Curated annotation (Swiss-Prot):
Keyword Transport among record annotations: no
Family assignment from sequence similarity: Belongs to the HMG-CoA reductase family.
Compartments, record wording: Endoplasmic reticulum membrane; Peroxisome membrane
Active-site residues, as the UniProt record annotates them: E567, K699, D777, H869
Region Linker, residue ranges: 364-466
Glycosylation sites: N316, N430, N895
The protein's name: 3-hydroxy-3-methylglutaryl-coenzyme A reductase
Pathway: Metabolic intermediate biosynthesis; (R)-mevalonate biosynthesis; (R)-mevalonate from acetyl-CoA: step 3/3
Lineage, highest ranks first: Eukaryota, Metazoa, Spiralia, Lophotrochozoa, Platyhelminthes
The organism of origin for this protein: Schistosoma mansoni
Membrane topology listed for this record: Multi-pass membrane protein
Gene3D superfamilies (UniProt xref): 3-hydroxy-3-methylglutaryl-coenzyme A Reductase, Chain A, domain 2, HMGR, N-terminal domain, Hydroxymethylglutaryl-CoA reductase, class I/II, NAD/NADP-binding domain
Gene Ontology annotations for the cellular component aspect, listed alphabetically: endoplasmic reticulum membrane; peroxisomal membrane
Length: 948
């Protein structure tokens, strides 16, 4: 039956394609006749000039149309397709475009008689300007995918019904096309003969365009798919073999699966055509609104036509013949019915009947296909009823003998059966009828229950690279049965978003409450940037609030810093530190070392051999040899030093290299592997134990990193006057210096913090927030937060010299998470230097850490830390979810200074701003007033200082 259906469909496709080609040839013949008639006639000069204007307008519109068309073909189709003959494919597309728009334009010559050449050109220009190219390319993409699958059976659905039943996306385009048709129809009733002539031709071109897009184009593409299938059959052996993989596909180098490695295709942007996820309620409202406009235009068209008809009767008939339609109804002749129908068609305009019928059919289809929300993330996937046969038989008291026989069967031979039922209840495990059905089925191995899918057939489809054709239910069954792994979903379905949805569905079956997964967001995210780069087994993403810090005045430039955090008061406190630094003249920063390290561990049979290896590495010849092998792996890597540290017969070799704008871990690892292969040529008895021997040291606190440095080593310094300290931070330099000594030095030493890890207040807060916002490796927070905070008193004017030293800040501006759109936007927000963006980023991070350290130390000194947290973190939330009663950041710097201030200070006098010769930006002088500062000896306030 299926073969007969395919034959009939193929016959229809050939017939429709041939009909359109014959029609095109006939129209070209008619056009040639018109052109010859035009050239043979005696044309006056004004007529030729009039025709020339139309020709110029048409040429301008045509050139614009060709430009848009070329961009769309290159961007929408040729970039995403996996077919190899792209030049021939490009020629085919342009041929189809020429055929389509030539047939649409020339149709006005046949269906609209007595059309002048100028009106023909102008109507064609209007049609080209208003033509919907999107639906044309969507149909091409839809059937191009079928061609890539080289399977004609999957393209057997017919034209208009195919698009309506397969995807709701086409409904939008069809409604838009019918709306344009109705607008052209209204223009034919404008009572201006010239405009009516133009839009009559345009209306006919639009109707022919609809017929081509939804009848001819699918038929032609299905014939093309059939041809591709035959070509595929001839080359099938070449494509199936492991050596015959085309350039557009690639094999996995190492597959985690126990089966053979399947072909992994490049990503295609076909998610808009297959598995299109929309908001049903929103689209239904848009469709309803569009259809109301469409019907209104039809009614307006009928009214205009009827009014024109009535006015003509008034001029040509007597008063008794004003309504000839009613006269024909009252007549007793049989022919009066035909006159009545003729008059109605004359009033309606027969061209309108075609798209009126299609519009009513489309509206009926929309009403019948109104989307219904499912219970789990708007996915209309039937529930899978799963029963394990062994458990079912063991619980059944009816078949004890069969249960005993089943226990003798090896576990590898037992299969799980998945049944699809119309109801929503799971199968009762104690139902003896289902067990009896299974036992009867097992007696005849050739018979298979109708409700059990052939898992072997589905697995074979995946091996052939046709996994994206499977339904969601079939893929979920393969996952549950162990035939498919969730990590392979992106390669199988070739749609990252659909893979995430399927993985969430599979995970929900293992949860006690499957609706928990609904609270993890996953929509509105480009997973193409994640797959194969940032994360595996993706089930969604985790949104984190991002706060704005700034302006931070760093080396004469102001920066606004994005900070991703869930800790209250952190952004507000850092803003206060930024304000103090801004008023003090800014921060000076410098990068004094830049190197990424990797330290493999090797083994030698004797300590003599290990010492010889160390001597060779320390020699100039050895270093240059290793450097040559190291640097050739990448154009951005540059080996700086090699440090060999022995431990008995083991040697830890620490390679240090510059890596450009990347953080460089993968780059250095690859280069180190190449250097080890080179080293083994000189020491054949060397054995590589591990590419990383923990002397790097990566993602662990280590003193070697603070001494020798890893990543970017940065120092940032600011000089704050006593007035700025008193006004903004409400303290003085002596108190901050004493607090730093007792907290950061003595307290960290008593706690046993290694190296610089404890010599700061909360540097990790800023490091973690900025790493999350800018797409850095979050695990690098461990060693990147090594920070030495120094607050010293300048005895000359009681000012404060604040500095932070960060020897191992491991950051990058390319690769990894910096590819993600949100993280890339945060990097762009920082306005990094074009020449050395990564060094600039490290200096900004160090400056932000300094601002945060100053504010927290001042808050601890003035005992405002708890008050601020109670004020902001324990604030009562407003009942309105769209409003917030408290804000952690403000745009006004004057409000930032009041975060820890419970006093209303009036600004009256001025203070000087600390002079900084390296800072070019000028800071306006501010008014100050005395402010009480807490005394060291008592709780009473000291004598008032002049503060800002």
């Amino acid at each position: 039956m299926l073969k007969i259906l395919n034959t009939v469909l193929l016959f229809f496709d050939c017939f429709s394609t041939g009909t359109f080609f014959v029609l095109l040839i006939y129209l070209f013949t008619r056009l040639r006749t018109h052109l010859l008639h035009f050239s043979s006639s005696n044309c006056h000069l004004d007529v030729i000039i009039y025709q020339s204007r139309a020709v110029i307008i048409f040429l301008v519109v045509f050139v614009y149309f060709i430009g848009v068309l070329t961009c769309k073909i290159n961007d929408k189709i040729l970039v995403h397709t996996m077919l190899r003959n792209k030049r021939q494919l490009n020629t085919l597309f342009y041929t189809l475009i020429l055929f389509t728009f030539a047939l649409c334009s020339l149709s006005s010559v046949l269906f609209v008689p007595y059309t002048s050449f100028a009106i023909f050109l102008l109507s064609t220009s209007v049609f080209l300007l208003f033509s919907d190219l999107s639906v044309f390319f969507i149909v091409l993409e839809y059937y191009l995918l079928e061609i890539e699958l080289v399977n004609y059976e999957h393209a057997k659905r017919h034209c208009l019904l195919s698009h309506l039943f397969s995807n709701q996306l086409f409904v939008d385009h069809m409604l838009g096309m019918f709306l344009k048709t109705s607008l052209f129809s209204i223009s034919t009733t404008s009572k201006y003969a010239y405009l009516e002539s133009i839009f009559k031709c345009t209306l006919m071109e639009q109707i022919i365009y609809i017929m081509i897009v939804f009848v001819f184009l699918p038929s032609f593409m299905r014939i093309f798919a059939s041809y591709a299938k035959r070509m595929y059959g001839e080359q099938k052996k070449c494509l199936v073999s492991n050596k015959g993989v085309s350039s557009s596909t690639r094999k996995r180098r190492h597959s985690y699966s126990s089966g053979h490695s399947y072909v992994e295709y490049r990503r295609m942007s076909v998610h808009n055509l297959i598995g299109y996820v929309v908001n049903p309620n929103c689209h239904y409202k848009c469709w309803s609104t569009t259809f109301v406009i469409f019907v209104s235009l039809i009614i307006l068209h009928l009214n205009n036509r009827y009014s024109e008809r009535i006015s003509s009767f008034k001029h040509n008939s007597s008063e008794n013949e004003v309504f000839p339609v009613l006269y024909h109804i009252t007549a007793y002749e049989v022919t009066s019915i035909f006159h009545f129908i003729y008059n109605i068609f004359h009033v309606i305009n027969a061209n309108l009947v075609v798209y009126l019928f299609l519009g009513l059919f489309l509206f009926k289809r929309i009403r019948l296909n109104k989307p219904i929300n499912s219970q789990l993330r708007n996915l209309n996937i039937p529930k899978i009823k799963e029963t394990l046969i062994s458990d079912q038989v063991k619980q059944s008291p009816v078949l004890p003998k069969f249960s005993k026989k089943l226990n003798d069967i090896p576990l590898q031979s037992r299969k799980r059966i998945y049944c699809l039922h119309k109801d929503d209840d799971y199968i009762d495990r104690n139902d003896s009828s289902s067990v009896s059905t299974f036992s009867n089925t097992c007696k005849n191995s050739n018979e298979r229950p109708s409700n059990v899918l052939d898992l072997d057939m589905l697995t074979e489809k995946i091996k052939q690279g046709l996994g994206h054709e499977l339904s969601d239910t079939e893929i979920l069954q393969l996952l549950s049965h162990g035939r498919l792994k969730t990590r392979e979903l992106e390669s199988v379905v070739r749609n990252p978003f659909r893979a995430v949805e399927l993985r969430r569905l599979d995970l929900s079956t293992f949860l006690n409450n499957p609706h928990i997964i609904e609270r993890i967001p996953y929509k509105d995210y480009d997973y193409r940037l994640v797959y194969g780069q940032c994360c595996e087994e993706v089930i969604g993403y985790m949104p984190i609030p991002v706060g704005k810090i700034g302006p931070l005045l760093l080396d004469g430039r102001s920066h606004y810093i994005p900070l991703a955090t869930t800790e209250g008061c952190l952004v507000a406190s850092t803003n206060r530190g930024c304000r103090a630094i801004f008023l003090a003249g800014g921060i000076k920063s410098v990068v004094y070392r830049d190197q990424m390290t990797r330290a493999p561990v090797v083994w030698f049979p004797s300590i003599i051999d290990s010492v010889k290896c160390i001597a060779w590495i320390d020699s100039e010849e050895g270093f240059q040899t290793l450097k040559s092998a190291f640097d050739k792996t990448s154009a951005h890597v540059n080996l700086l030093s090699v440090f060999a540290c022995p431990a008995g017969r083991y040697i830890h070799i620490r390679f240090a290299a510059r890596t450009g704008d990347a953080m460089g871990m993968n780059m250095v690892s690859k280069a180190t592997d190449s250097a080890l292969h080179c080293l083994k040529k000189y020491f054949s008895n060397m054995q590589v134990i591990s590419l990383s021997g923990n002397m790097c040291t990566d993602k662990k606190p280590a003193t070697i990193n603070t001494i020798l440095g890893r990543g970017k080593s940065v120092i940032a310094e600011a000089h704050l006057s006593a007035d700025v300290l008193a006004q903004v931070l409400h303290t003085n330099a002596q108190r901050l210096a004493r607090l730093t000594h007792s907290k950061n030095w003595i307290g960290s030493a008593m706690a046993g913090c290694p190296g610089m890890m404890g010599c700061n207040a909360h540097a990790a807060n800023i490091i973690a927030g900025m790493f999350a916002a800018t797409g850095q490796d979050l695990a690098q927070v461990v060693d990147s937060s090594s920070c030495l905070t120094q607050l010293e008193v300048d005895l000359s004017d009681d000012s404060l010299v604040a500095s932070v030293t960060m020897p191992c800040l491991e950051v990058g501006t390319v690769g990894g998470g910096t590819r993600l759109s949100g993280q890339r936007a945060c990097l762009d927000l920082l306005d990094l230097s074009v020449d050395r963006p990564t060094e600039h980023l490290s200096r900004i991070i160090a400056g932000t850490v300094l601002a945060a350290e100053l504010s927290l130390m001042a808050a601890l000194d003035t005992d405002d830390l708890v008050k601020a947290h109670m004020h902001f973190n324990r604030a009562k939330q407003s009942t309105n979810s769209h409003s917030c009663s408290h804000s952690t950041t403000t745009d006004n710097n004057d409000n930032i200074s009041n975060i820890y201030d419970n006093h209303n200070v009036a600004l009256s006098s001025k203070i000087p701003v600390t002079d900084n010769s390296d800072i070019r930006e000028s800071v306006h002088s501010l008014h100050v007033k005395p402010f009480p500062v807490k005394s060291d000896l008592s709780v009473n306030p000291e004598i008032s200082h002049y503060t800002m």
